[in-house]
Amino acid sequence: MKKSESTWILASIALLVLCAAACKLPFSSTAVPDDAATAALQLAQTQVGISATQTALAPAPTEAPAPAATEPALPPTLEPDTPAPGTTRYTFGNFQFDMPDYLALDVNHTIVPAALEGDEAFPGAIQPEYLSITFDGYIIPDAFHSPEIGVYPVADYMEISQPATDTFEELNYLLVNRPQTIPYDAGLPFIPFWNAGQIFNAQAKFVDFKSGSGIRFLSMYAQAVYPVDNYNIFFTYQGLSADHAYFISMVLPINSAALPMHAEDPADYEAFINSFSTYLQETSAMLNAEAPERFTPTLTVLDAMIASMRIIP
């Protein structure tokens, strides 16, 4: 109950006491209260005075302070995505990568129109429109293959080519399972389709890029039995974006310190044919034993270029 209400009640009690005392007095010209009435009146007056004093001394109510305003938390600062030293960033359409400066003098790109030759055509004669990136002044001038990166739309390729569909499924299976050991004659998935056969692989390794993953390896394609040499081998990367929207094929000439530039024809060609499988297995093992820096360009540099690749949304 509030103090003002208490004061009012006490004053009312005092008035009632006085009235009660007055009822006991005789009607005379001079009213003289008895001792009980006087004591009651004094008590009521004292309580009223105490209540008034307490009300005066009570501190005035104060409002609770408003909570201090807090500044919104700032988002974390992201590290700037800049090319590594010694590389140059290239962006063509929605494809981006950082090329080591010593790999080539210049980089070009073009949109290759779709080639639709029908279901009976050779697989290499069928492909959707795709982005082709080529290199001028490549570090290895004498090679059978031309350096190129191709970026293909997966859905468009699958719509027109069953061999491409099979290749994407094989590649995806490899990327999901990532076997620890890959046989030299595994016949790894590879695009573009050439009119020749993959005779071996070496230095196979799964490498992720910023928008997906893939497998890189060394290989050589041939239409006949022929020794492995630097002129014919190449480095390739076969990758899929994480959303399976794009396929990336990289074909780059490469040299190994363990191989001749141009192999000589075997002295006994028939014996070479009969032992060709053993020869390829031994060649693959020899290349697998080579350090990454024993190749030109080095496997370390090429892996870093792969890791820098990005499909821009």
Placement of each model-derived feature along the sequence:
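Intrinsic-disorder-associated interaction segments
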Residues: 33-37, 41-46, 50, 67, ...
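Residues at structural and domain junctions
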Residues: 5, 9, 234, 288-295
